[in-house]
From Swiss-Prot:
<feature type="binding site">
    <location>
        <position position="149"/>
    </location>
    <ligand>
        <name>S-adenosyl-L-methionine</name>
    </ligand>
</feature>
<dbReference type="InterPro" id="IPR001678">
    <property type="entry name" value="MeTrfase_RsmB-F_NOP2_dom"/>
</dbReference>
<dbReference type="InterPro" id="IPR049560">
    <property type="entry name" value="MeTrfase_RsmB-F_NOP2_cat"/>
</dbReference>
<feature type="active site" description="Nucleophile">
    <location>
        <position position="247"/>
    </location>
</feature>
<keyword id="KW-0698">rRNA processing</keyword>
<keyword id="KW-0949">S-adenosyl-L-methionine</keyword>
<dbReference type="GO" id="GO:0009383">
    <property type="term" value="F:rRNA (cytosine-C5-)-methyltransferase activity"/>
</dbReference>
<dbReference type="GO" id="GO:0005737">
    <property type="term" value="C:cytoplasm"/>
</dbReference>
<dbReference type="InterPro" id="IPR023545">
    <property type="entry name" value="rRNA_ssu_MeTfrase_F"/>
</dbReference>
<dbReference type="InterPro" id="IPR011023">
    <property type="entry name" value="Nop2p"/>
</dbReference>
<keyword id="KW-0489">Methyltransferase</keyword>
<comment type="function">
    <text>Specifically methylates the cytosine at position 1407 (m5C1407) of 16S rRNA.</text>
</comment>
<dbReference type="Pfam" id="PF13636">
    <property type="entry name" value="Methyltranf_PUA"/>
</dbReference>
<dbReference type="GO" id="GO:0003723">
    <property type="term" value="F:RNA binding"/>
</dbReference>
<feature type="binding site">
    <location>
        <begin position="125"/>
        <end position="131"/>
    </location>
    <ligand>
        <name>S-adenosyl-L-methionine</name>
    </ligand>
</feature>
<dbReference type="GO" id="GO:0070475">
    <property type="term" value="P:rRNA base methylation"/>
</dbReference>
<dbReference type="Pfam" id="PF01189">
    <property type="entry name" value="Methyltr_RsmB-F"/>
</dbReference>
Length: 479
């Protein structure tokens, strides 16, 4: 693999020499940082099993190497990236996999370790969505996830990735992470705080990542991290699990933040060791039981992961002073909900008791039941998924609901050929050789729902959202 030149401030190198355990080679660290990062993907098991994904992609010539800490994760090598970018493959467009750095799969693995099965989870800094979608897959789209993102522009990206992956148990919020301890005290079974950090571990992806680095900035960032982990710990219920992670390497933003929390709440914080998280985890294990992953250990990004348990309740913070405002939705009455469910089933849309119907004007939404306890406590940017819009002739079913809840085995499902599917993803109407019988058609490809279409004569009218339309080559088999 080609080398690239990474910028290292002298003070950073001094700090790394002090932080690195004696069992590791500093020369190996420098050499690893100069190698470009291996690409990796995570199979979206909400859509397809790992075995079926491997069978589907076997003809493509992809080399997939298992990632030890994530059974659905793989390092990927492919020869045709220039001809067909990985993010433009139809398997990616239909949500069968997520392009995710291998190290960033570690925090969710830690969150669900030892049989942990939380029902209400918060992802404090969620965008672009790799960990939120990984959490949703581990929860099998059940329970509820509060995915928060401070950056307004990233909230849209977060929603797009959640929608593409067919996820319906998520509520999105747009706050600074400091608010949650006061706003929703002790309400979550598990919390992931993948904290904003100095990014020292990402130099293999971004050789200039340390251009603005300084020891002083590390101190400033660590102060913010202490505020965030304190807020998250207040929002965690007694007995719950908190995973703290960063993509940086200094101790000030990692071990020291966790030790500060333990010193602040000595009787309420328990460190849960991660040495048995996966075979070979002990190579990155700290004396506290955290994983401090230097890039040469597993040939990946630098990363840090700690797992904590809240052993008992702590005093509440002062109530927040902001006003949430009126909640513009109302629950749909049982009789009407039954009629809506029946109409949805006719086009292949079904959902279980984890979701409940709510209405706003002519809009119908599905909200995760587990998030209802938070209504009135925080203001949501987006909650659940939009199911349909009502009109005089019935319902206009929404694309995100189709991706999340349509069954490809529905009687009105119509499987496209590769050529037809390529037209569909480009936003064009499709003219199948043998037109379907039904007027309202669930369009599928590779046995995956990719949208709804209305049959008009010999053509299928395309309803693929304009913002998702793609140009260029889309199919690995044609590359």
């Amino acid at each position: 693999m080609a080398q690239h030149t990474v910028y290292f401030p002298d003070a950073f190198l001094t700090q790394m020499r002090e932080a690195m355990p004696s069992t590791l080679s500093f020369d190996d660290f420098l050499a690893a940082c100069q190698r470009p990062l291996r690409r990796s993907i995570r199979v979206n098991t909400l859509k397809i099993s790992v075995a079926d994904f491997l069978q589907l992609t076997a003809p493509y010539g992809w080399t997939l190497t298992p990632i030890p800490w994530c059974e659905e994760g793989f390092w990927i090598e492919r020869d045709n990236e220039d001809a067909l970018p990985l993010g433009s493959t139809t398997e990616h467009l239909s949500g069968l996999f997520y392009i995710q750095e291998a190290s960033s799969m570690l925090p969710v693995a830690a969150l669900f370790a030892d049989g942990n099965a939380p029902q209400r989870v918060m992802d404090v800094a969620a965008a672009p969505g790799s960990k939120t979608t990984q959490i949703a897959a581990r929860m099998n789209n059940e329970g509820a996830i509060l995915a928060n993102e401070f950056s307004a522009s990233w909230v849209k990206v977060l929603h797009a990735n959640i929608s593409r992956c067919g996820i319906s148990n998520v509520a999105l919020t747009h706050f600074g992470g400091r608010v949650f301890g006061a706003a929703v005290p002790e309400m979550f079974d598990a919390i992931l705080l993948d904290a904003p950090c100095s990014g020292e571990g990402v130099v293999r992806k971004d050789p200039d990542a340390l251009k603005n680095w300084s020891p002083e900035s590390n101190q400033e960032i660590a102060a913010t991290q202490r505020e965030l982990i304190d807020s998250a710990f207040h929002a965690l219920r007694p007995g719950g699990t908190l995973v703290y992670s960063t993509c940086t390497l200094n101790r000030e933003e990692n071990e020291a933040v966790c030790r500060w929390l333990k010193e602040t709440y000595p009787d309420e914080v328990e460190f849960l060791p991660l040495g048995d998280l996966f075979p070979g985890a002990n190579k990155a294990l700290t004396e506290e039981g955290f994983l401090h992953v230097f890039p040469q250990i597993y040939d990946c990004e630098g990363f840090f992961v700690a797992r904590l348990r809240k052993t008992q309740a702590i005093p509440a913070l002062p109530a927040p002073k902001y006003k949430v405002g009126n909640f513009p939705f109302s629950p749909v009455k049982d009789r009407e909900a039954g009629q809506i469910r029946q109409a949805a089933a006719s086009v292949g849309l079904n959902w279980d008791g984890n979701l409940r119907l709510w209405q706003r004007d002519k809009e119908l939404w599905l909200f995760p039941v587990g998030i209802e306890a938070l209504i009135g406590k925080v203001r949501f940017s987006r909650l659940g998924i939009k199911l349909a819009e009502t009109h005089n002739k019935g319902y206009r079913w929404q694309h995100e609901a189709v991706i999340a809840h349509a069954s490809p085995d529905n009687v009105n499902a119509f499987e496209l050929t590769p050529q037809e599917a390529e037209e569909w993803y480009r936003g064009r109407d499709v003219y199948p050789q043998a037109a379907p019988v039904a007027d309202d058609v669930l369009v599928t490809f590779q046995h995956q729902p990719i949208g709804l279409a209305k049959r008009i004569g010999s053509r299928l009218k395309n309803s693929y959202p304009r913002e998702l339309v793609r140009d260029g080559k889309l199919f690995t088999s044609n590359a």
